[in-house]
Amino acid sequence: MELNGKTALVTGGSQGLGEQLCRDLAAAGMHVIVNCVRSAARAETIAKETGGRALVFDISDSGAVQSAFEQIETLDVLINNARVDPYKRPAEMEDAAWFDRVFGVNLKGPYLCSFAAAEKMKGRGGKIVNISSVWAYRAANRRMLEYAMSKAALHTLTRSLAKQLAPGITVNAVAPGMIESKEIQERLTPQEQEALRKSIPLARAGTAREISNAVRFLLENDYVTGEILNINGGTQFV
């Protein structure tokens, strides 16, 4: 797909990897719709700086998704990037409620948005890219359990939609490993960060730009679908 002049929706586009994706796609000539649910002011800023627009809605709410997509005239690309951070579980939240929140955003959101996007892409073609994680392949500890489960299920959604929506729409995923981010700096001591980097065969964390480049490859290549592109420095061979 030639990106220039096309329209992309990036969920969770107001920070981190989502912001990087918005800025890089805009630089490639795309009109970018910046989605978020809580950081409306930040989304508006990014949209203004990239010549796009902000669209605030909860991707886990079917009614909100339907209403939001009614406001989108044409759509060529959907990046399902929004996620629930496994380190931000409220202490008082019960297991069942946390499960629902994680799966609501990490799986139900991409499910709802992908089908809504597919309707917009009928007859014109399009690209869907899901942002997964290396945790999809791992036996998770208690903190990461729901997150890992949701990302593994996202792989099933990716491959299933790739078959269902072909030939006009390709559906792929990118599964990052450790990525340099503000969250990593906040959660881990310098010693812990260094230990993690040393455990990676390439001896460093990845960058948001490297993940964004992988997404762009999947958007520009018209003969790849149903694939999980692993960007993890050799941490996990699949």
Q: What function would you assign to each model-found segment?
A:
Residues V105-G123, A162-K163, P167, R216, ...:
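Amphipathic alpha-helical dimer-interface segment in Rossmann-like NAD(P)H-dependent oxidoreductases
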Residues S14-Q15:
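Conserved glycine-rich cofactor-binding loop
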Residues H155, L165-I179, V224-I231:
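Conserved Rossmann-fold SDR core element
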Residues A40, V56-S67, A96:
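The beta1-alpha1 cofactor-binding region of Rossmann-like NAD(H)/NADP(H)-dependent oxidoreductases
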Residues R204-I231, Q236:
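C-terminal substrate-recognition "lid" of short-chain dehydrogenase/reductases
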Residues V84, D95-L112, V129, L154, ...:
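Catalytic Tyr-X3-Lys loop
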Residues K127-A153, T158-A166, M178-I179:
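Catalytic loop of short-chain dehydrogenase/reductase
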Residues R89-A91, D95-F103, I184-Q185, E192, ...:
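Substrate-binding pocket helix/loop in short-chain dehydrogenase/reductase
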